[in-house]
């Protein structure tokens, strides 16, 4: 975002989800094994951690209840090979919420739940498709 200062103590992403886990260290290890996240900053042994993935993805793992919020949360994680990433997550112990599916809008995705019940949509772009080609409407640029 133009005009926003960066800080070496905070993730540079414009939007950073903060997810609560009962065991921060176990969550960090699991997210690394299942999704390839890398720990960037650790705040205490069990209080909080900042993780990165890819060139611009970030998530904060915070100490807290294992129960996800009552609102339906979903964190979307874009990957280069969704079939491999989905299998990796399941092999690490993720629960399948919805199997992989190829969508008319050019994405292939599936949803898994992690060790604390947070849902992750793993997605891969398989082709560039105009929103108008599948019933959407372009209303502004990215």
Can you annotate each of these PLM segments?
Residues 56-60, 69, 117-119:
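Short, charged/polar, Gly/Pro-enriched secondary-structure boundary elements
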Residues 60-61, 85:
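Hydrophobic alpha-helical segments typical of transmembrane helices
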Residues 43-45, 67, 103-104:
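A short beta-turn/loop motif at secondary-structure boundaries
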Residues 61-66, 124-126:
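Acetyl-CoA-dependent GNAT
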Residues 1-10, 14-22, 48-54, 66-142:
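Vicinal oxygen chelate
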Residues 7-12, 18-58:
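Core segments of cupin and vicinal oxygen chelate
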